[in-house]
From Swiss-Prot:
The lineage of its organism: Eukaryota, Metazoa, Ecdysozoa, Arthropoda, Hexapoda. GO terms for cellular component: lysosome. It comes from Drosophila persimilis. Disulfide bonds join 72-78, 172-188, 327-354. This is L-asparaginase-like protein GL17509. Keywords: Disulfide bond, Signal.
Length: 457
């Protein structure tokens, strides 16, 4: 028993060293550097606007984060999607969502799916101030906004059509449907559910986050007295299904703050963020005694274990102004930091490299992988997707990036069969009849025929 205790102690001491290559370093901000303003992505103008308000004195955190959102929603300095009505849903509707949280008393106000009102963050502020609710949505949110004095506006139809028409002419690709007919990869609908026996194994299509084309931004302000506010603003995912609510409006998904411990901003695939509430998880990790760096990495690893294809980032700030970040699926995750020391202001764009999702999930590729290299159609009752499968065996220690470059370039899709009964089933079928294989019969085929990055199930 004594030996086991020593081994456990040794492993605990060595764990930070073993994880050092993946860790994201914390950036301590001395007390004299407070107040502190952090915003996601590299939108320096919006951060500057928020910082101008924050540095006016204590208890300006709420107005500071609101000012940052106002700058984004009233200009194109935070990208076309946020300021230019360029993120319609699949029916051409333009809606906004926003949220605001007070770290002193946990008051929260948010709106989602709100059309015709530009000042989404202002309406969210009114929900926080004038109601006992936390979230209003849809047409009712717009009516509430008008009752609070916000003017209804007509969005630019030409700007929306410039985005929507090419998408419609391209058979509505990409979209957010799956397991429907007609096939979502080749049609704009109207869709209906596929019979249960024809539905494919669940697999997400992740859309890349392009620099300067972000549909969500978050702001977090901390003053010298320890007051925290966080706010978020989003135009929603482009070509989303009408009625969809995003992470920017959901408590703990995009933003969270608690004066007692700190706050967090999360951004990326909103549908994944809403399932895990990473901003809340990060703040609770701080409460449990973790540093911002370890909290950010732990939360990101948790997301990746369940959604290996996730793209996004997370910034975590302690109540003392120490901050760190973690990300996945991006070349680099950037955020803007402003602070003050001895009357002198500083502002910088921070950039971090993301975790290697392959190593986070599996420690590197090994075992049997099946690369779908060709798709053909065969008739029989109903059309059936036949996929030609190439068997590839990797030994332990093969570098994941080398594997991608050598085997996966220009492939239509890739899948990894988990160890277990289904994997054995696939192996036996391949041994008996290598070549064409009806993967859908085993429930292993991805949705047709989107292109996928290298994905671990």
């Amino acid at each position: 028993m004594r030996y086991l205790c020593r081994a456990q102690l040794l492993s605990l001491l060595l764990l930070p060293l073993l994880k050092a290559r993946l860790s994201v370093p914390a950036h301590p901000i001395p007390q004299s550097f407070l107040p502190l303003m952090i915003s996601t992505w590299n939108y320096t103008d919006a951060n500057r606007e928020a910082w101008t308000v924050l540095r006016q004195g204590p208890r300006r955190t709420r107005q500071a984060v609101i000012q940052g959102c106002l700058h984004c929603q009233n200009s194109n300095s935070c990208g076309r999607l946020l300021g230019g009505h360029s993120a319609p849903d699949s029916s051409g509707g333009i809606t906004l969502e926003a949220a605001l949280i007070d770290g002193a008393n946990m008051d929260y106000g948010a709106v989602a799916g709100m059309a015709g009102i530009r000042n989404a963050i202002g309406v969210a502020h009114d929900v926080l101030r004038y109601t006992n609710h936390s979230l209003l949505v849809g047409e009712a949110a717009a009516r509430f906004a008008e009752a609070m004095g916000h003017k209804k506006e007509v969005h630019s139809l030409s700007t929306t059509l410039d985005v929507l028409l090419p998408w419609l002419l391209g058979k509505c690709q990409p979209n957010f449907w799956r397991n429907v007919r007609p096939l979502a990869n080749d049609s704009c609908g109207t869709f209906s559910p596929l019979p249960q026996e024809q539905q494919q194994r669940e697999m997400r299509q992740e859309y890349p986050i392009e620099p300067g084309h972000h549909d969500q931004v978050g702001f977090l302000a901390l003053d010298t007295e320890g007051h925290l506010h966080a706010a978020s603003l989003s135009s929603g995912a482009r070509f989303r299904i009408p009625g969809r609510v995003g992470d920017a409006a959901v408590p703990g998904a995009g933003i969270y703050a608690d004066n007692q411990v700190g706050g967090a901003l999360a951004t990326g695939d909103g549908d994944v963020l809403m399932r895990f509430l990473p901003a809340l998880l990060a703040v609770e990790a701080l409460r449990a005694g973790q540093s911002p760096a370890s909290a950010a990495e732990a939360v990101m690893r948790r997301l990746l274990r369940h959604h290996t294809e996730f793209n996004g980032g997370l910034v975590v700030v302690s109540r003392l102004g120490v901050y760190s970040a973690a990300c996945a699926g991006l070349d680099e995750f950037q955020f803007v930091v402003s602070g003050e020391s001895s009357g002198r202001s500083m502002r910088r764009v921070e950039g971090i490299k993301c975790l290697d999702r392959h190593e986070v999930v599996t420690g590197g590729p090994r075992g049997n992988f099946y690369v779908v290299s060709k798709k053909i159609w065969a008739a029989g009752g109903e059309d059936v997707l036949v996929q030609r499968v190439e068997k590839i065996t990797l030994n332990e220690g093969v570098d994941s990036r080398e594997f991608e470059e050598e085997y996966l370039e220009d492939k239509d899709a890739e899948i990894d069969v988990d160890e277990g009964e289904k994997a054995e089933e696939v192996r036996s079928l391949l041994d008996e009849s290598p070549g064409d294989l009806l993967l859908h019969q085993l429930g292993l085929a991805p949705p047709f025929p989107f292109r996928f990055p290298f994905i671990y199930f």
